[in-house]
């Protein structure tokens, strides 16, 4: 059951000034939220990543390659995706540039 909402954030590199960040666009998607598993956490730590949460989207087509998302007022970097049938899991870590 999809019981939560995240906002996938995409960048538009064509819309910016010379010294400005690219403009961003947010898209709302429904998901299920679960914690990152211990094995996943330990494997990621070996690569200097700190997975915190896994968002499961019921339809993999809803994910369009975004690198960041917003949930609960915080920005997260998407560090891993895993397709499982029609679903896709997005493993994320908290962004340091909030």
Please give the residue ranges for each predicted region:
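Active-site-proximal polar cores
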Residues: 1-20
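Short, conserved turn/kink motifs that form compact alpha/beta structural patches or helix kinks used as
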Residues: 21-98
């Amino acid at each position: 059951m999809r019981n939560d909402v995240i906002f996938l954030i995409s960048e538009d590199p064509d819309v910016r000034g010379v010294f400005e960040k690219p403009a961003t666009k947010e898209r709302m998607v429904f998901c299920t939220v679960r914690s990152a598993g211990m094995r996943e956490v330990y494997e990621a730590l070996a690569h200097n990543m700190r997975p915190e949460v896994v968002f499961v989207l019921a339809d993999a087509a809803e994910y369009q390659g975004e690198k960041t998302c917003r949930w609960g007022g915080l920005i997260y970097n998407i560090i891993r995706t895993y397709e499982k049938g029609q679903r896709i899991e997005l493993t994320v870590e908290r962004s340091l540039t909030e």
